[in-house]
Amino acid sequence: RNQFGDSVGIYHSKMTPSARYKAWKKFRSGELKVIIGTRSAVMMPAPKLGLIIVDEEHDASYKQQEGFKFSARDIAIKRAQIIKIPIILGSATPSLRTLKLVEEKKFQTVSLTKRVTQKSPPKFSILDINEVKLVSGLAPQAIEAISQTLTQKKQAMIFINRRGFAPQFICSYCDWKAMCNSCDSSLVFHHQAARLICHRCDSAFGVPTHCPSCSKAQLSFLGTGTEQLEETLKELFPKTAIHRMDRDSTTKAGSLETILSEINNSDTGILIGTQMLIKGHDFPNLELVVTVDVDQGITSLNSSAVEEMGQQLIQVAGRAGRSDGNATVLVQSRYVNDQNLLQLKSGNYLNFAKSLMEQRQATTQPP
C-alpha cells in the first residue's frame, strides 16, 4: 500500500464472509488492482488480469488436501497460460517440478546470487545423536550451543515442524495408540488445551486416564512438539525470553504481530516454532538454528519427504546470520552419513536438487 495505495487488497479464509465478499467484488470490478491472498485467491475473477506471482512456490500448503482438492500453484500456472499473461514463481528453494520445467526450457530463470544483506551464509554442522540422551528432543551439545548464544546476547531458534506437546499417545501394555474417530489419523496431545487433537480434521477428544483397549493405567506420550520444547527450555533458561510461534500460539487476532514485535525488540532470546517461523521473517539478531526432527525427511516413505526436508533446512538457515554473517545451523540426526544430508551441508540447494533429480531419474520417479 506504500507503493500502490488503496488499490491493494487482501483475501484469505480468516476474514469475515462480508469482508471477503467486498474484496472479491472490488477485485472483480477493477477497483482493486492488486490482491494478496491465500489458495482460494487464485480463482478470483478480474477484468484485466496482467500478472500472477506465486511466492514460495515450493510450499506444500498450496495444495488443498480436504474437500475440493486442488493445487493453487498449478491453477495459477494454467490460468496464466490460458489468458496468456506472465507468471512469476518465486522461491529460494524451487520445487523439483519447477526445476524440471526450467530444464525443459518451459520456464525462464532469474537468479539472485547474493543475500540481501551481503553477509556470508550460516555454517552447517551435523550433530550425531546416536547413543545420546536427549532432553525433549535436544542433545546436550545443542543445549550448550544455545547457552553460549544467549551469553553472547544473541538469539537462538529451535525448528521443529510438530506443534503440540507430543505427537503420539500410547499404551505401553497393549500398544494401543490414540487415533482420530473421524479420519483415522494419529491424535496429538496438547498440554495447554489438555486435549488430544487431530491435526488433519481438527477433531478434539479428552485425555483418558486408562487405556480404552485394555483398561490398564499405562498410558504415555511419545515424541516432542513445540509445547514440550517451550516448557523444557523455560526450565533450562528461566531468565530468558522464549517465544513460541505455531498455529496454536497465533490464533488470536494480533498475536502473530505481537510475537514478532517482541522478538525484534529484544537482543537475546529463544525462538521455537514450526514452518511458520521460516516464511520470510527477518530476525537480525539470530545467530543459531537447531533443527530437531530432520530424520523424518530421511526415513519417511513419502516420495517428496527428502525434497521437503532440503527446502526446510535451507529456508530455516536463511533466517540466521543476516546482520553479521557469523551464524551456525546445528542439524541433529541419527543418519549423519546420509548422502542427501551431506549434500545439504554445503548450503547449496541447487546442487542438492540436482543430485536428488538424478536419484529420481535412476529409479524412474517423477518429475
Label for each model-derived stretch:
Residues 1-367:
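Inter-lobe coupling/hinge segments of SF2-like helicase ATPases
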